[in-house]
């Protein structure tokens, strides 16, 4: 019984597309990280100013 080996070639020339999508993904990740940090900073500010009212409002809305 003979066994055949086959080699699969790469996508051939798609490296630029991969690099472009990687750069776009990195940019999107950085933007989302920045937006998340801004939101967390805003939450921290609210909690520093008025933690008790924040907790009361949360519990009144059905939070546990």
Curated annotation (Swiss-Prot):
The keyword Coiled coil applies. Is modified by deamidation of its C-terminal glutamine to glutamate by the deamidase Dop, a prerequisite to the subsequent pupylation process. Pathway: Protein degradation; proteasomal Pup-dependent pathway. It comes from the Bacteria. Pfam families: Pup. Transmembrane segments: none annotated. The keyword Coiled coil applies. GO terms for molecular function: molecular adaptor activity; proteasome binding; protein tag activity. The modification Deamidated glutamine is found at residue 64. Residues 1-37 are annotated as: Disordered. Keywords: Coiled coil, Isopeptide bond, Ubl conjugation pathway. One of its GO terms (biological process) is modification-dependent protein catabolic process. Residues 21-58 are annotated as: Mpa/ARC ATPase binding. InterPro entries: Ubiquitin-like_Pup. Residues 23-52 form a coiled coil. There is a cross-link at residue 64 (Isoglutamyl lysine isopeptide (Gln-Lys) (interchain with K-? in acceptor proteins)). Belongs to the prokaryotic ubiquitin-like protein family. The N-terminal unstructured half of Pup provides a signal required to initiate unfolding and degradation by the proteasome but is not needed for pupylation, while the C-terminal helical half of Pup interacts with Mpa to target proteins to the proteasome. HAMAP family: Pup. Protein modifier that is covalently attached to lysine residues of substrate proteins, thereby targeting them for proteasomal degradation. The tagging system is termed pupylation. Among the identified substrates are the FabD, PanB and Mpa proteins. The glutamate must be located at the C-terminal position to be coupled to the lysine substrate. Strongly interacts with the proteasome-associated ATPase ARC (Mpa) through a hydrophobic interface; the interacting region of Pup lies in its C-terminal half. There is one Pup binding site per Mpa hexamer ring; the K(D) measured is about 3.8 uM. This is Prokaryotic ubiquitin-like protein Pup. It comes from Mycobacterium tuberculosis (strain ATCC 25618 / H37Rv).
């Amino acid at each position: 019984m003979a066994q055949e080996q086959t080699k699969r070639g790469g996508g051939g020339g798609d490296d630029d597309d991969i690099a472009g999508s990687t750069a776009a993904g990195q940019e999107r990740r950085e933007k989302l990280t920045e937006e998340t940090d801004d939101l967390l900073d805003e939450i921290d500010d609210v909690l520093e100013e008025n933690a008790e009212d924040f907790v009361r409002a949360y519990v009144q809305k059905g939070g546990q």
